């Protein structure tokens, strides 16, 4: 067995800006998304080459998820932003959502429904409707749907993790208060 190291150069000695924050696979291609503090690098694991670098312009990336189609990426940051990237359009965000009042800890796409969610240290979970069109000339439509409140903020930490049900519109959130909450429509 052999291990690949396509991101050997992402870390320089003593620099936290290059330390890996989170990783995610592309749903259909042999691509790996590697988020460092300020950038998201997309590597082709077969070619062992850098495909592109996303430049969100945030201070610190906290979380990342790839749309089931593989053409879109959302990321959360500790400076309260959720950003949507269209991989076919640009390396800069298509849309920046600034609805949270504290650091964003988690973002997640629903595997089959046009939904995504973000969780933050303000103790809230924001749910969005995201319509992705097959027409390449039409941009994605992002609509905030609901703010879910229920987690208590503990020592400046709120909601830490999110998970969608594979087929139903059910969302589970885990908070620093020690609770896991199931959200249903």
Briefly describe each language-model feature range.
Residues 4, 47-49, 89-91, 132-134, ...:
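Short coil turn/linker residues within repeat-based beta-strand modules
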Residues 35-37, 76-79, 119-122, 174-177:
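Conserved strand-to-loop turn within each blade of WD40 beta-propeller repeats
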């Amino acid at each position: 067995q052999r291990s690949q190291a396509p991101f050997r150069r992402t870390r320089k000695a003593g620099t936290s800006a290059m330390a890996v924050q989170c990783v995610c696979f592309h749903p259909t291609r042999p691509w790996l998304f590697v988020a460092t503090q300020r950038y998201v690098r997309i590597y082709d694991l077969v070619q062992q080459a850098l495909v592109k670098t996303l430049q969100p312009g945030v201070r610190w990336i906290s979380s990342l998820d790839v749309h089931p189609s593989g053409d879109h990426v959302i990321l959360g940051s500790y400076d309260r932003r959720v950003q949507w990237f269209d991989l076919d359009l640009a390396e800069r965000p298509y849309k920046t959502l600034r609805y949270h009042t504290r650091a964003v800890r988690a973002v997640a796409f629903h595997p089959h429904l046009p939904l995504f969610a973000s969780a933050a240290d303000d103790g809230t979970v924001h749910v969005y409707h995201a319509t992705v069109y097959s027409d390449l000339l039409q941009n994605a439509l992002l609509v905030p749907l609901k703010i879910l409140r229920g987690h208590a903020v503990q020592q400046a930490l709120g909601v830490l993790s999110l998970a969608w049900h594979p087929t139903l519109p059910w969302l589970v959130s885990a908070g620093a208060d020690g609770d896991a909450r199931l959200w249903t429509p």
